[in-house]
Structure formats: structure tokens, C-alpha cells
Amino acid sequence: MLREFSFYDVPPAHVPPVSEPLEIACYSLSRDRELLLDDSKLSYYYPPPLFSDLNTGFPNRFHPPKSDPDPISIVKDVLMTKGIQMNSSFLTWRGLITKIMCAPLDPRNHWETYLVMDPTSGIIMMEERTRSETSYANQDRMCYWGYKFEAISTLPEIWDACSRDQIEQRDNQDVVPDEQYCSIVKINIGKSKLILAGEVDCIWDKKPCSAKESDVHSDDGTIEEDASNAENPNLHYVELKTSKKYPLENYGMRKKLLKYWAQSFLLGIGRIIIGFRDDNGILIEMKELFTHQIPKMLRPYFKPNDWTPNRLLVVLEHALEWIKQTVKQHPPSTEFTLSYTGGSKLVLRQII
């Protein structure tokens, strides 16, 4: 079985209703990939010194991330352990939905994900089994620049609880990407209910008291927000990025900002902080953006046929509905691949 979905076959439409992403659980991963059912690896933002050298510590203090992606069963296990029932169409990683949403921006990109409907819950679970990243010159060092920027922009505790040494010695610490804090959110996009998990780089101030997990699932299995006792922490979270700086007239810069927006939008992250660097990896400028302001900031630069945030959301809504309806035509536990090999189409194949 093979089915295709073309971005350009999606008719113009109003933007689908999208709910605010609500955190329903979180977890941490140690540098040894031990699963911790808490927020112990949540980092706190603290501005790095300008003109920091992002090469410092490479490669001697760099502990590269493990090569294989995490299975989505980790997230399922966290929710089950915490007693949070899942009432959704999809359970997957934020990054994979970002790939689907932003595929029209990358007509030369290639990736593949795996899907299966859980026979018990009926949820479509989606994951990567191998990393599908395009290689390029100087890749290891440039990836390190991003990890290093995160390391020198964060503290293990809120700043007034840290020692002077912890603040001033950030440039000398090991860079360990496998140590992570992850947020699990529920979000509705059109008729599709999703539970998404994604890494959070840091928090702007202090994590507010979120809903007790015992308060967010009802007798009928749906997840509910207890608004009287909870504040959604996701608006306090920060996404950290590094980039060369180009004017917004540059299509590549607009495309990059659209991806930053999509990635943070899907997890409900409130701020994006970009460290602009030169060709040698020197941090030359910092820019703080509120996620919701990026579409408005880009609007004057869009041309008639450009992929705008609204247009990407319409395509995502249709793609999710297409995946749901196609998978439901087959028995539960049937496995599929969803692939993109460039151009204008997603391809869904049944694994025989």
C-alpha cells in the first residue's frame, strides 16, 4: 500500500483552530540516559558574555549525543507511570510534527518516520528509528557551537541560588547534549488531538506550579486543565538557537525563523533567544524574540507564493487528517513509514 499527500493539492482555507499547548507531564534524562520522572535537569537562562568563543572545549570537553533517536515508548511509559491517561489521535515527538509542518520549506530535504496504531488505545504512535540529517562540511564543529551556546547560556538553578563560580565558569564545563529536560504537552490542531514531547533548553525565570498530574485526567480518560490551581509553565520556557545573521529580506533567514517559530509554537514555548555568531564561531549579538511575534515580524517580507505560518498550519491540519484516515483503514498494529524525499509530497507506505 502506498499513498501520497501533495502540499499543493491542499485548497486555500482558514487557519485551523489550535489550542494552547498545555504541559501534562515532564521528565529528565541524565548524561547516562537514565530516565528521571522529575524536572531535575531543567536549566535556567542566564545571558552569556558577548564575544564568547563557541569553539572553546571542542573536542576535548564535548560528549557527543547518542546516535539513535529515543523511542516514543519512553513518553508512553512516563505517562503511564504518572497515571495520566491518553486521549489523543497521535503520540509523538514535537520534532517530527515540526518536520511535517515545515516540509514545504525544504524541497531538497529527506526524512523518514515510522507509524503504528496502538491496538489498546487507538493512538497513532510516530517515531524516528534512525537520524535522517543531511551532512555538510564542518558539521561536527558547527553542531558543537549550538550545544556550546546552550551550555554558556544556562545555569543548573535560578541565578540567585548559584554561586559566582557556577556563573563565571560556564565556559569551562563539559558539553553534554544527552542531559535533557523534556516537556510533554497536549495540543489540538483542527480535529486532531496530539500529545507531543520535546526537549526544553531552559526556563526564563522560575517554573510555576503546574497542575497536579492527579488533577489532569478525568473519569472518562480525557486530560483536563485545572485552571484554578495551575499555571501552564510552557510560556516561561526558552528555546536557544545559534545562527549567522542575515537581513529579513534574505529568504534563508526567513525560512530559518519560520522553523524556529514552528518548533516553539508546537510546544508552547514563549521565547526564542538567538545567539548570532560569525563564521569563526564567535558570539557577536543576542536577540530575544517572543514566539508569537515572529509571524507578524515576517509578514511584510512575504511574497505572494511564500509559505507563511498560516499556510503551513493549514497543510499540517490536512496532513494529520490524511494520516489518521489512511492508518484507520488498516488493522491496529499495522506498521507504516511516512517519508519525505523532497519535492511536494509526503508518502505513506505500509510495511509488509
UniProtKB/Swiss-Prot annotation:
Consequence the record notes for mutating E199A: Loss of pyrophosphohydrolase activity
This enzyme's EC code(s): 3.6.1.-
Binding site for substrate: R33, W93, R94, G95, C182, E199, K241, Q263
Main localization (coarse): nucleus
Cellular component terms per the entry's GO annotation: cytosol; Las1 complex; nucleus
Reactions it catalyzes: a 5'-end NAD(+)-phospho-ribonucleoside in mRNA + H2O = a 5'-end phospho-ribonucleoside in mRNA + NAD(+) + H(+); a 5'-end (N(7)-methyl 5'-triphosphoguanosine)-ribonucleoside-ribonucleotide in mRNA + H2O = a (N(7)-methyl 5'-triphosphoguanosine)-nucleoside + a 5'-end phospho-ribonucleoside in mRNA + H(+); a 5'-end triphospho-ribonucleoside in mRNA + H2O = a 5'-end phospho-ribonucleoside in mRNA + diphosphate + H(+)
Modified residues (Phosphoserine): S218
Compartment annotation: Nucleus
Record GO biological process: cleavage in ITS2 between 5.8S rRNA and LSU-rRNA of tricistronic rRNA transcript (SSU-rRNA, 5.8S rRNA, LSU-rRNA); mRNA processing; NAD-cap decapping; nuclear-transcribed mRNA catabolic process
Cofactors demanded by this protein: a divalent metal cation
Transmembrane segments: none
InterPro entries: RAI1, RAI1-like_fam
Cofactor note: Divalent metal cation.
GO molecular function terms noted in the UniProt entry: 5'-hydroxyl dinucleotide hydrolase activity; GDP binding; metal ion binding; mRNA 5'-diphosphatase activity; phosphodiesterase decapping endonuclease activity; RNA binding; RNA NAD+-cap (NAD+-forming) hydrolase activity
Binding locations of a divalent metal cation: E150, D201, E239, L240
Keywords, sorted A to Z: Hydrolase, Metal-binding, mRNA processing, Nuclease, Nucleotide-binding, Nucleus, Phosphoprotein, RNA-binding
Pfam families linked to this entry: RAI1
Job description of the protein: Decapping enzyme for NAD-capped RNAs: specifically hydrolyzes the nicotinamide adenine dinucleotide (NAD) cap from a subset of RNAs by removing the entire NAD moiety from the 5'-end of an NAD-capped RNA. The NAD-cap is present at the 5'-end of some RNAs and snoRNAs. In contrast to the canonical 5'-end N7 methylguanosine (m7G) cap, the NAD cap promotes mRNA decay. Also acts as a non-canonical decapping enzyme that removes the entire cap structure of m7G capped or incompletely capped RNAs and mediates their subsequent degradation.
Quaternary assembly: Interacts with dhp1/Rat1; the interaction is direct, stabilizes dhp1 protein structure and stimulates its exoribonuclease activity. The interaction also stimulates din1 pyrophosphohydrolase activity, probably by recruiting it to mRNA substrates.
Family designation: Belongs to the DXO/Dom3Z family.
Protein name according to UniProt: Decapping nuclease din1
Naturally occurring in which organism (per UniProt): Schizosaccharomyces pombe (strain 972 / ATCC 24843)
Gene expressing this chain: din1
